[in-house]
């Protein structure tokens, strides 16, 4: 049986509180790497250590608690619960935390306070993604994992969502790890990893960081 190596020779270190971008074309392995960091998938060799804890040494119950307490996930598809309001969707995330953020303050930060009682079907794509981010961040996770969070949005709405992720990173101090194929987005990152064919080809600290609102593509 021929095995395909999706990732090979990966070695990366991310500092607490950094805005980090994993950049690469489709099929480069960036989403798989994000899933391994998030303990959704597992590597055949090597390990992920977050705050010194190796996820491969945890049993399933420990992993579940670890994901709940320390990780937040934002995907290209919003995955909101259709029969719950904006507030209720965010509350789902709050229930998973011992130390959730204040929901009213968070909705104001997200720019969706006036949409609190609406259902997902009544929202624009950008409003749905803001709600999805709210559900992920209300847990106050150490790390926010974002897989193509602007992939389904137009460029103006994309920049609004990126500005929101930037604001959250600065306000709450969460480490943000974002997967994207959009080369321009790397300019807002503190640290950039460029992937190609399952390998990290570039790894650098961005000395000329640009505000999300000033990104151009």
Question: Can you say where each PLM-predicted feature lies in the sequence?
Answer:
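Conserved beta-strand-loop-alpha-helix hinge in the C-terminal portion
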Residues: 199-217
């Amino acid at each position: 049986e021929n095995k395909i190596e999706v990732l090979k020779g990966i070695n990366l270190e991310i500092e607490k509180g950094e805005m980090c971008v994993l950049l690469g074309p489709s099929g480069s392995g960036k989403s798989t790497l994000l899933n391994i960091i998030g303990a959704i998938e597992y590597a055949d060799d090597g390990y992920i250590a977050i705050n010194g804890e190796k996820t491969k040494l945890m049993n399933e119950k420990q992993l579940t608690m670890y994901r709940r307490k320390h990780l937040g996930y934002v995907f290209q598809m919003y995955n909101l619960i259709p029969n719950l309001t904006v507030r209720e969707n965010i509350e789902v995330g709050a229930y998973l935390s011992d130390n959730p953020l204040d929901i009213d303050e968070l909705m104001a930060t997200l720019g969706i306070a006036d949409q609190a009682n609406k259902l997902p079907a009544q929202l624009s794509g950008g409003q749905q993604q803001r709600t999805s981010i709210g559900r992920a961040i209300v847990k106050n996770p150490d790390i926010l994992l974002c897989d193509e969070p602007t992939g389904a949005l137009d460029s103006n709405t994309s920049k609004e969502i990126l500005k929101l992720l930037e604001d959250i990173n600065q306000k709450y101090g969460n480490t943000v790890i974002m997967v994207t194929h959009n080369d321009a987005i790397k300019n807002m990152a503190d640290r950039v990893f460029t992937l190609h064919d399952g390998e990290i080809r570039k790894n650098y600290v961005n000395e000329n960081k640009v505000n999300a609102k000033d990104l151009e593509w």
